[in-house]
Amino acid sequence: YGAVSAAQMRTLAKIATDFDRGYAHFTTRQNLQYNWIPLARAADVMDALAAVDMHGIQTSGNCIRNITSDAYAGVAPDEIVDPRPYCEILRQWSTLHPEFAFLPRKFKIAVSGAKEDRAAIGWHDIGLQLPI
């Protein structure tokens, strides 16, 4: 459901060039994964992310993963409720919540607001179907 500004995308590309091997991997849940950042440079990467209002908090490991929705959220003709604001509220609530930092396993949430469930909510740990 998320959007990345041009400045944020340029920063992500610069991180790949300056701190990794020139590329990054988009995960299934739309995280960007760098595999070769030297530990000694990790703080520099966090500073670069913070400069464009991004962070690395709970982006991997046993925590709540990116909250997903319909790929057509906001423009789907059968959409009754736009799920993106609900995803953002859940993200803000869970990101810094200490109870979600060390879950026994990665935890996945999806939100759908359309008649057709393109978010596959039944395959997630929590799948929310907004009223239609």
What role is predicted for each listed range?
Residues Y1-I132:
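Small-residue-enriched alpha-helical segments and adjacent helix-cap loops
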